[in-house]
Amino acid sequence: MNSYSSSLFRAKALIFILIMFNTLKIQAFDIDRFDQSNAFALGRDLVAMPFGMNLLEVNNANADELVIGIHGGISEGYEWIYPLWQLNNEFNQVFFYRWNDKRCANANNANLVNQIDTLLDNYSDVKKIKILSHSYGGTHLLYSLDLIEQRIANRNQDLKIEIHFIASLLSPPLLLRLGCQFKTDFKDDYSMNIYNWKTIQEIDGAFRNYRKDPQEISISSASQTRLPESYNGRKLGHNWSISWVADEIKESN
């Protein structure tokens, strides 16, 4: 009897610990609880989330806008903490899309589109979607554009879609293009609003050694913006670019 009681107590204690652990994890990813002074630790938690679409706040079924962040290759996550917090408001839902950045960026793009489709099923009041991509995540989004446009058209909904490429690898070097069989011909015009935010190549740690600026894109309808040299007293390089763009988006809304 004592052995049974002891085992039961241990089982209950284990369940309690698991519940507390999961609760703490949920709280860690509540966008309203983000602590800007702890961005590196929070960033590690962010990129440890499972592949797929991860909600970063308490669910609001009546949200009329979705904000989705798509990380770059080997992301440490910290570069997304402030931008996602900045873009959050009481009327939207903020998500972080984890994808396998060790694969070619034109692989498994249907998964991103399917998950966006599921979000629209779950949030029936949504009128606008903002998708922000960074670095190699921009490559993944670029090769998803046609699928996203087709899927949105099939839904026959009145939706405004904003695509934001931020310091993104949109014109990959030849070896990567050949290895992944990246296409280089894109439509001149899309039904979505496309914004290309480009850092100054010479001060971008990820792109400064490229012979040509890999942030250029052949979509003529895309809005092109070159970022300044500094941001809040810092050099505006590769990772700070998301924060600068988030401020611009917030100010324009």
Q: Model segments located where?
A:
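Short, aromatic/basic amphipathic alpha-helical patches
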Residues: 81-89, 148-151, 178-185, 207-219
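Bacterial N-terminal signal peptides that target proteins for export
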Residues: 3-13
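C-terminal catalytic-base region of ester-bond hydrolases, centering on the histidine
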Residues: 183-253
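Cleavable N-terminal signal peptides
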Residues: 15-16, 26
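Active-site catalytic motif of lipid deacylating hydrolases and related acyltransferases
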Residues: 28-127
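Serine-dependent carboxylesterase/thioesterase catalytic core
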Residues: 99-102, 106-204
